[in-house]
Curated annotation (Swiss-Prot):
InterPro entries: aa-tRNA-synth_I_CS, aa-tRNA-synth_Ia, Leu-tRNA-ligase, Leu_tRNA-synth_edit, M/V/L/I-tRNA-synth_anticd-bd, Methionyl/Leucyl_tRNA_Synth, Rossmann-like_a/b/a_fold, tRNAsynth_Ia_anticodon-bd. The keyword Metal-binding does not apply. This is Leucine--tRNA ligase. The gene is leuS. PROSITE patterns: AA_TRNA_LIGASE_I. It comes from Psychrobacter cryohalolentis (strain ATCC BAA-1226 / DSM 17306 / VKM B-2378 / K5). A motif ('KMSKS' region) lies at residues 670-674. The keyword ATP-binding applies. SUPFAM superfamilies: Anticodon-binding domain of a subclass of class I aminoacyl-tRNA synthetases, Nucleotidylyl transferase, ValRS/IleRS/LeuRS editing domain. Belongs to the class-I aminoacyl-tRNA synthetase family. The lineage of its organism: Bacteria, Pseudomonadati, Pseudomonadota, Gammaproteobacteria, Moraxellales.
Length: 919
């Protein structure tokens, strides 16, 4: 039986109680700790009621759904990296999706047609592990989690087009990556080969180098082994130059850190491939090595090969010690980082190769730091000029020959006992025969000129980047659409037979890939000869699904194309992509690669998938713990601790509620289950409301920097929202008392000719705020400073007391503009209050700056005497400097400091007058 799960109907939040603004009480009377109580007094700010009402309205109106049809509006595609459906949101999710939503709402107000979709990265090993633990199919676990997380996301008030939702574990999605795989296979961009891989013996799967930590599997913790297994590869190295060169297009649009990481990961280097001839079993052959330092070739004193290299295998055939050593080398990680830290060990094979320049015999060693999967599986060793080679040579007493001149005194500062004294810089060649006295470039060309005609060397460009092995020996993933036939070998599935559907009623037991034991899945017929055959049971690396999901959002339900070209042309590239920097060299590189693959299949246009990238900072929180008698550590949830804070809001004392005894206040660390310092967004939303949580996550720190979570600090944004509620309440009451209609206030032009000084100041602050927030969001991508600006404007509004109909109109303008801008960050209260003020929130635009409101009739200038402030004066802007000097000297509070001779008078236009007095 094959279960075909579909995403369940979307949840709608509705309320039978509508808050009102009539006779609203002040914010200060609301109880912070009881905002989730359904108070009978509807005049208080009750976020749960307002937010449920607004969310229900948005869902009913399908407010945020967008069409693929042409539009008069410019399009904008905003996307945060979609989540893995773990079942529960964390604060990192909240921050990530709030950033995207703020930008989405801002651009809608600016007149853009904005697409902000959401989907689910459904495949992956965590679902298998959960299925094993809970004895339930991963499909059931995954889709139940999707339902739960969708409901949580909706509580945040995100302006998502839910009609475009999909999960990557649905056949309707993954059939298209199977289709693309077949197209690439036809082109030779997919191939199968034996590969030495990191094998996790517990999870029974291949691990990428990045998933091996200190020689152990990142999830299971088991010691990793090396194994040779057949795997499918994407030929990403064919696109290495383009992937590297196109990073230039992203300069200024992506964080420089990410661009640098990708440049280093691709790692293009120019050098020379050198051939060391040898005779073996009567056959002539050569050991090929790549080097970026051919100038050191005369300093080669040994060569090192991987345990899997043919020379090492030949040497081990009749030598048990070498065979045992090669077997030892296969135990452990193939990750470069682990190899760099591991002790360098080796064994002399007894074989030699011929030095191409000197004709001397060079010993061949097998070494644990050489990988068969990197280059040719062999390196030339120059101990005098390479730190790793020096370490190895000194350990095994191998010759060290200096061939690069070392400046006098270069090693004078080396600490006593430092055994690594290799000189690795470029300089003039010495001890190199005919090449003595040459610099690097001269030696490169001279050696090439001598060796290339003999076919002993050639110029070569090499990459650190390796082809992408996408086979995974696990169940919960996209089936690879290939068949293994006894007669025909490896045969691709016919396109008309796609998708190859993954059985979904499987409960894995943790012992290998269960697909191998499902005859209904494995047994098939060969597409080529029709004889019985077996399906491939490996599944795709889950990075495959996440490498093209952004493009599928343009046409998520297209049944005839992987990506609809017309829809892709409207929406792609993604205008703003948001996610963690930890994805810099995996997901982001693979997505760039897939975009180029899809471009070459004429599915999308352009060279890059993401026009702009923001990497948001992590959410951190305090830790509280006790060290137990056995040395173990117990971490406690913040909710279980009573904390005393100092005046700066820093915790100074922590008591465990259950026993009244102190606990240690630990470091601020990334929220994690292991440290019990995570904060449940649901609890926080229930207490303060989603608008407050949204404001807090963006106000507290710049979006690209870490956020230190503090429950106590939530009260600041919460009090701000309550203040806005109070201001709106009092304003509506004032309009009622003055018998003014909202219709007239919203439509009549404001007469600014005879405004009071206070009214002009409020208008000026309003329009300064409009301009500043527009610049912060639209140009600087600064998401925290607009909240500060909104708070300042709210303070001005709170202090302003309208005493006439005209001033009420000024107040009304300021309040509506404040609410429009606030609705970007706190959409529930913002839109609710705008509706209370008679405005249609569907057709609202971002307010325009009235330049005339920024003109000041009078400005305040500071007066200094010898650099110290001694007074202030109100003057007309751009007043005559001589008049300003005279006016400043005449002020009584200033004159008493002018007893000495006036040496100089400095006027900084519209800012200050500084009088310099002798003595």
């Amino acid at each position: 039986m094959l279960w075909h799960y579909k995403i369940s109907p979307h949840l709608s939040v509705i309320t039978d109680s509508e808050p009102t603004m009539t006779n609203a009480v002040t914010a200060e009377t609301a109880n912070t700790n009881h905002t989730n109580n359904a108070s009978s007094d509807k005049t208080q700010y009750q976020p749960q009621l307002i937010e449920a009402q607004q969310q229900a309205k948005w869902a009913t109106d399908k407010r945020f759904e967008v069409s693929n049809e042409p539009s008069d509006k410019p399009s904008r595609y905003m996307l945060s990296m979609f989540p893995y459906p773990s079942g529960k949101l964390h604060m990192g999710h909240v921050r990530n999706y709030t950033i995207s939503d703020v930008l989405s709402r801002y651009y809608r107000l600016k007149g853009y047609e904005v697409m902000q979709p959401m989907g689910w990265d459904g495949f992956g090993l965590p679902a298998e592990n959960a299925a094993i633990a809970n004895q339930t199919p991963p499909a059931k676990w995954t889709f139940e989690n999707i339902d739960s997380m969708r409901a949580q996301l909706k509580l945040l008030g995100l302006s998502i087009d839910w009609s475009r939702e999909f999960a990557t574990c649905s056949p309707e999605y993954y059939q298209w990556e199977q289709w693309l795989f077949l197209q690439l296979y036809k082109k030779g961009l997919v191939y199968k080969k034996l590969a030495t891989v990191n094998w996790d013996p517990v999870d029974n799967t291949v691990l990428a180098n990045e998933q091996v930590i200190d020689g152990k599997g990142w999830r299971s913790g088991a010691m990793v082994e090396k194994r040779d297994i057949p795997m499918y590869y994407f030929n990403i190295t064919d696109y290495a130059d383009e992937l590297l060169d196109d990073l230039d297009q992203l300069e200024g649009h992506w964080p420089s850190e990410v661009i640098t990481m990708q440049r280093n990961w691709i790692g293009r280097s120019s050098g020379m491939e050198v051939h060391f001839p040898y005779e073996l079993a009567g056959q002539s052959n050569s050991l090929d090595v790549f080097t970026t330092r051919p100038d050191t070739l005369m300093g080669v004193t040994y060569v090192a090969v991987a345990a899997e290299h043919p020379l090492a295998q030949y040497a081990s055939e009749n030598n048990k010690a070498i065979a045992d050593f090669c077997a030892l080398c296969k135990k452990g990680s193939v990750a470069e980082a682990d190899l760099a830290k591991a002790e360098k060990i080796g064994m002399d094979t007894g074989l030699t190769v011929t030095h191409p320049l000197t004709g001397e015999e060079v010993p061949v060693w097998v070494a644990n730091y050489v990988l068969m999967s990197y280059g040719s599986g062999a390196v030339m060793a120059v101990p005098a000029h390479d730190e790793r080679d020096y370490e190895f040579a000194t350990k095994y007493n191998l010759p060290i020959k200096q061939v690069i001149d070392i400046p006098a005194g270069y090693f004078d500062d080396v600490e006593e006992g430092n055994e690594n004294c290799a000189y690795t810089e470029r300089n003039t060649l010495v001890n190199s025969g005919e090449f003595d006295g040459m610099d690097f470039e001269q030696a490169f060309e001279a050696m090439l000129a001598k060796l290339e005609p003999q076919e002993l060397a050639k110029k070569k460009i090499q990459y650190r980047l390796r082809d992408w092995g996408v086979s995974r020996q696990r169940y919960w993933g996209c089936p690879i659409p290939m068949v293994n036939c006894e007669h025909c070998g490896t045969v691709p599935v016919e396109e008309q037979d796609l998708p190859v559907v993954l059985p979904t009623d499987v409960v894995p037991d943790g012992r290998g890939n269960p697909l191998k034991n499902i005859p209904e899945f494995v047994n098939t017929t060969c597409p080529k000869c029709g004889n019985p055959a077996e399906r491939e049971t490996d599944t795709f690396d889950t990075f495959v699904e996440s490498s093209w999901y952004y493009a599928r959002f343009a046409s998520p339900h297209d049944t005839t194309n992987m990506v609809n070209k017309s829809a892709a042309n409207k929406w792609l590239p993604v205008d703003q992509y948001i996610g963690g920097v930890e994805h810099a060299v995996m997901h982001l590189l693979y997505a760039r690669f897939f975009h180029k693959l899809m471009r070459d299949e004429n599915l999308v246009s352009g060279d890059e998938p993401f026009a702009n990238l923001m990497t948001q900072g992590m959410v951190l929180a305090g830790t509280f713990y006790r060290v137990n008698a056995d040395g173990s550590t117990t971490y406690y949830f913040t909710k279980d601790i009573d904390i005393d804070f100092n005046e700066r809001g820093q915790p100074i004392k922590a008591i465990l509620k259950s026993d009244g005894q102190p606990v240690t206040i630990g470091k601020i660390e990334k929220m994690s289950k292991s440290k019990n310092n995570g904060v449940d967004p649901q609890i926080t939303i229930d207490k303060y409301g989603a608008d407050t949580v949204r404001l807090y996550t963006l106000f507290t720190a710049p979006a690209d920097q870490t956020l230190e979570w503090s429950d106590d600090a939530l009260k600041g944004p919460y009090n701000f929202v309550k203040k806005v509620w109070r201001i709106a309440s009092e304003h509506i009451q004032a309009l009622t008392d003055a018998n003014l209609s909202l219709e007239s206030l919203n439509s009549d032009a404001l007469n600014t000719d005879s405004l009071s000084k206070e009214a002009k100041a409020l208008r000026r602050k309003t329009h300064e705020t409009i301009g500043k927030i527009d610049s912060d969001l639209g140009k600087r991508l600064a998401l925290n400073t607009p909240v500060s600006s909104l708070m300042e404007l709210a303070n001005e509004l709170s202090n302003f007391k309208a005493s006439s109909e005209q001033e009420l109109q000024v107040q009304h303008e300021a309040l509506t503009d404040l609410l429009i801008m606030l609705s970007v960050y706190a959409p529930h209260i913002g839109e609710y209050l705008l509706e209370q003020l008679g405005l249609d929130t569907v057709t609202l635009n971002y307010p325009m700056v009235d330049e005339s409101a920024l003109v000041q009739d009078m400005i305040t200038m500071v007066i200094q005497v010898n650099g110290k402030m001694r007074g202030k004066m109100d003057v007309a802007p751009n007043s005559d400097p001589e008049q300003l000097k005279a006016q400043a000297r005449a002020i009584e509070g200033v004159a008493k400091f002018l007893t000495g001779e006036i040496k100089k008078e400095i006027v900084v236009p519209n800012k200050l007058v500084n009088i310099v007095v002798a003595g």
